[in-house]
Structure formats: structure tokens, C-alpha cells
Amino acid sequence: MNTSDFNFVFLGQSVLRYQVPLDIYDIINHIYETKYPELKPANKQLVGKIEKEHSLFFDGPPNNKMTKHNLLPQNVFQWFHEKFTHYLQWNKVVDYKMHFNSVWVNQMFEHEYNPVHVHQGTLYTGLSSVMILKLPKSFGVEYSAADAPQNGRLQILGSSSGMFANIDYQPDIKERDFYIFPYDMRHTVYPFNGPGMRRTLAANMDVEYNPIRNRGVS
């Protein structure tokens, strides 16, 4: 098939997947494991039905749920900043300001889950993310429809509709995956059964931008 006349144009929101460099991946896991007794619980500001939700970084307004703190080194910040910047550039967003709002880790065990939700930081506009830090050897028995596994899955739900639209994304997640998507893109994590644990990181980057200024940018 000759595709020399092909060009790609899409309407709607996008999810970008990156691979985390091994050094960044190791640093984050090391901080979580060695600093665990010092980590601030993040449960009060999250919707997850998860016991172990802990914050690594917060730079939003002080409130009764969380105060400012940081356990991440500069090279990790720089890597996050580069990836969020790439997302905005790839989506041709212009004239924006970014502010790194928060980073936390969810460590999930059997039957725990994250219901469908969206994110926000200090602003309602911005980018969220999911980084896969650890996975169990198995997500357990699929009690039905084993050919379409759901246990332990991340599902990201798009807001586009109409013929031929991709309305959801359910990747075959692997350790060191890093997914970036807009704050208002709904997503969920299904429970699994059996031994082991599933450790993921979420990071929120506030993005101040003018949607009118960005309308029709190409």
C-alpha cells in the first residue's frame, strides 16, 4: 500500500507513553522503600480504595490535608519536567506556564482499587500521569472472559465520541511505563486477586494556558 500521501491529524485528547530511564526508576523506588517511615499519608486527598498511599512531593497551597514537602532529587524533577514539556509540545500547546504540583505513590494489594476519577492540582488545568514501579507476577484468576483480562488493569477513558473514535485505552502495562494525559481525562485501576503488590506513581503538573489562543494551532 502506498502511503506517501499520508498525514496524521487527530481531534481530541491524547495519552503519551514514555519509558522511564533505569536510573530514574531505581531512584524513585529506592526513595519510597528507604524513606517509607517518613512519608506523609496522602489518603485524605485521594479517592483510591487503597491503604498505602504516600506523598513524595507537594507544592500546592498548605491545607488541612497536606503541607509542602519534597523527597525527590533535582535530576528526577528535571526528567519529569522534560516529559511534561514534550507532551505539550507534541500537542502543539503554546504560551503556557507549568508548575509541578504533587507526586505520590500508590501501593496496592489484593482487592484494592482506584475508582473512576479525574485529577486537579492548584489549577483545574494540567497534566496527570501514571508510572509503573512494581507489578505482581500475576493479577490472579479471571473468573470469566479470560481472553479479555481486566484484573489489575489501568483504563483511561476518553471524552471523544462518534464513529471510529477511540473511547478508551487499556494498555498492557509494564514496569517503567510512564503515561501522561490531561487532568480531566477519567481513569481507573481495577483490583487484582492473589499475592504480590502493584506499585505506581502519580505526578500532577499544573498548566496555565489560554485555550482560545491555542484554538486551531497546527
Regions found by a protein language model. Give the residues of each.
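Short beta->alpha connector loops
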Residues: 110, 185-186
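Non-heme Fe(II)/2-oxoglutarate
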Residues: 1-95, 111-114
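Hydrophobic residues positioned within well-ordered beta-strands of beta-sheet architectures
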Residues: 16, 101, 127-129, 199-203
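Short acidic alpha-helical/loop segments enriched in Asp/Glu that coordinate divalent cations
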Residues: 93-99, 141-144
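Ligand-binding loop in jelly-roll beta-barrel domains
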Residues: 186-200
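Catalytic core of non-heme Fe(II) oxygenases with the double-stranded beta-helix
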Residues: 104-180, 196-197, 211-216
